[in-house]
From Swiss-Prot:
Protein name per UniProt: ATP synthase subunit c
Species this chain originates from: Wolbachia sp. subsp. Drosophila simulans (strain wRi)
Transmembrane segments: 8-28, 52-72
CDD domains in alphabetical order: ATP-synt_Fo_c_ATP5G3
Cellular compartments annotated: Cell inner membrane
Biological function: F(1)F(0) ATP synthase produces ATP from ADP in the presence of a proton or sodium gradient. F-type ATPases consist of two structural domains, F(1) containing the extramembraneous catalytic core and F(0) containing the membrane proton channel, linked together by a central stalk and a peripheral stalk. During catalysis, ATP synthesis in the catalytic domain of F(1) is coupled via a rotary mechanism of the central stalk subunits to proton translocation.
PROSITE patterns: ATPASE_C
Encoding gene per record: atpE
Site feature: Reversibly protonated during proton transport: E58
Disulfide-bonded cysteines: none
Length: 75
């Protein structure tokens, strides 16, 4: 197989990291809304933990994006 073709396959596989980040953030906020619906008094405490968790998941998506950009332009 050509080296350029392998490069584009690797870029396509790196995009799955961004897909995982999107699904992870959706799952986090869905669980938060379910928790607030069950116990509205815990909203303030939940928000801080949810934002920290969402930031960690988003960092993984951004790292996948940076990896894809590095593969496109540097490799």
């Amino acid at each position: 197989m050509d080296l350029v073709a392998l490069k584009f396959i690797a870029i396509g596989l790196a995009v799955f990291g961004m897909l995982g980040a999107g699904l992870g953030i959706a799952n986090i906020f869905s669980a938060m809304l379910n928790g607030i619906a069950r116990n509205p008094e815990s909203e303030g405490k939940m928000k801080s933990y949810v934002y920290i968790g969402a930031a960690m998941v988003e960092i993984m998506g951004l790292l996948a994006f940076v990896l894809a950009m590095l593969l496109i332009f540097a490799a």
